From Swiss-Prot:
The keyword Cell membrane applies. GO terms for biological process: vesicle-mediated transport. The gene is RAB11B. Keywords: Cell membrane, GTP-binding, Lipoprotein, Membrane, Nucleotide-binding, Prenylation. One of its GO terms (cellular component) is plasma membrane. Belongs to the small GTPase superfamily. Rab family. It comes from Nicotiana tabacum. It holds the Pfam family Ras. GTP binds at residues 21-28, 69-73, 127-130. This is Ras-related protein Rab11B. It is found in: Cell membrane. A lipid is attached at C214, C215 (S-geranylgeranyl cysteine).
Length: 217
């Protein structure tokens, strides 16, 4: 890594992301592909909640993503509030081969927006893009929906590692930009923030500026 070795817990920002969408759309495999570069064909539905972390570089800052994954099945919806709390980014995932999972995106978006800050960065993700011959949701329909809902959009394949890195990286980069804009809007000099100051993008301080400096370019 440029600039020398940095310890795992050495980061400038910590951003909480959530993965949502129907059960079986590939949320857990997207998470394992991004965080560990692994894919498990035998993966079962996630029971309860799990999360993984990974740090990336944005500009000259280290951004650590804490990515939460839960089953999309209705019986787990009691964990909703705690799951969303503090999230500043979300990947709303559907399966391009199952149209019903795309139809349900609207409900997932409503639930997400009911529980998070208005500035949350959202990426609509059409997963399983490797199954082109089974496609049930057109790229054009999904793009049009994303534009109407003011979200980003990308098609991915956790199996082939297609666009997985790009989807997470784009969300994290956009969150970073939002944090920087908010610091600038209130008249702060982002480079002069007191050490350890938190900038709230969401409803609590899960996503925080850990050290001095923001967007100094």
């Amino acid at each position: 890594m440029a600039g020398g070795y940095r310890a795992e817990d050495d980061y400038d920002y910590l951003f909480k992301l959530v993965l949502i969408g129907d059960s079986g759309v590939g949320k857990s495999n997207l998470l394992s592909r991004f965080s560990r570069n692994e894919f498990n064909l035998e993966s079962k539905s996630t029971i309860g909640v799990e999360f993984a972390t990974r740090s990336i570089r944005v500009d000259d800052k280290i951004v650590k993503a804490q990515i939460w994954d839960t089953a999309g099945q209705e019986r787990y919806r009691a964990i909703t509030s705690a799951y969303y709390r503090g999230a500043v980014g979300a990947l709303v995932v559907y399966d391009i081969t199952r149209h019903v999972t795309f139809e349900n995106v609207e409900r997932w978006l409503k639930e997400l927006r009911d529980h998070t800050d208005q500035n949350i960065v959202i990426m609509l993700v059409g997963n399983k893009a490797d199954l082109r011959h089974l496609r049930a949701v057109s790229t054009e329909d999904a793009k049009a929906f994303a534009e109407r809902e003011n979200t980003f959009f990308m098609e991915t394949s956790a199996l082939e590692s297609l666009n997985v890195e790009n989807a997470f990286t784009e969300v994290l980069t956009e969150i970073y930009k939002v944090v920087c804009r908010k610091a600038l809007e209130v008249g702060d000099d982002p480079a002069a923030l007191p050490k350890g100051q938190t900038i709230n993008v969401g409803k609590d301080d899960v996503s925080a500026v850990k050290k001095v400096g923001c967007c100094s370019s």
